[in-house]
Design a protein with these regions (language model features):
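Surface-exposed, secretory/extracytoplasmic low-complexity segments enriched in Ser/Thr/Asn/Gly/Pro
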Residues: 1-67, 74-76, 80-93, 98, ...
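Exported/periplasmic cell-wall-interacting domains
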Residues: 70-73, 84-155
């Protein structure tokens, strides 16, 4: 702001580089990059792009809507990844083979206890906020994703 005011006061034409509180993951092309996870809550579907190529497209089950455990929308990043994790919370203690958290205790993981994904399952039988994913797709994402990869969650 000071630079802009100084430029105005000087009365001369100037080029000023803006200063940002937050910046995009990158500035060239698009801001999110070529490797990212996209999750549509309304479609109960997840896509994983790596180097611009669609690697995984899968139905998922997200947070239980009727219990108020909706998966949070926003833009996040994979915090870390872990094999053979135990997820513990109110009323559950679940082993998962592939755990990729992206926001607090919310993440992408396999859900071997489910035999179907997608549709309206999340309305009454959804997760506590995580993205339940079929085993083979969670495995493929896990084997191809790194810490810091953007995760975009939207309705």
């Amino acid at each position: 702001t000071t630079k802009i005011l100084d430029a105005i006061k000087s009365g001369q034409s100037q080029t000023i580089t803006p200063e940002y509180t937050y910046t995009a993951y990158r500035r060239e092309k698009d801001e999110i990059g070529d490797t990212y996870v996209e999750i549509s809550l309304s479609k109960q579907h997840m896509w994983f792009f790596k180097d611009g190529q669609l690697l995984v497209s899968t139905d998922v089950v997200t947070g239980n809507h009727n219990k108020g455990w909706d998966t949070h929308t926003g833009v996040y990043a994979i915090m870390y990844k872990e094999r053979d994790a135990t997820l513990v919370g109110e009323g559950y203690n679940s082993h998962v083979n592939y755990w990729m958290p992206f926001y607090a205790n919310t993440g992408i993981h396999d859900a071997t206890w489910r035999n179907s994904f997608g549709g309206s399952i999340y309305m009454n039988d959804g997760s506590h906020g995580c993205v339940n994913t079929p085993y083979e797709n969670a495995e493929k994402i896990y084997n191809n994703i790194e810490k810091g990869v953007p995760v975009v969650v939207y309705n």
